[in-house]
């Protein structure tokens, strides 16, 4: 749970029990909101034009998102709006060996020298991950690379690309799934 706490709430909450971290994170967020908006509230009450945004939102959800053999994936979803044109959404996956509790990253999961082959497979599935050709044409890059943010399922491995990472904001989070049978010998045995 230590890794989940740090992924969900940040390094300031590392080492805390999950419920205590959630409570502190929530209270810290309210404190930040009050401190940030106090001056704007005073301006508003006095009738002066205020540049402040009083409508803040922060949604944080975590869930088990899949598994493959002994590896389980836990995903943390976060939407934040604290003013501006739009909010920001992030989705980060953490993979763990359920028998040992050890974190499993790309280098653990794939054989040495995997990046080039995996990049080609990811790129070949990118168009299928988008709703239409217009969305595909809007991407910043079409030859994508593994970014370390992946989750496992019965269907395959899914890479998660954040807003602005490979495409414009309006495309949102882009998820590219590769079926297990296409990964061939790239995956290590007995992780």
Where are these regions (language model features)?
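Compositionally biased intrinsically disordered regions enriched in Thr/Gly
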Residues: 1-191
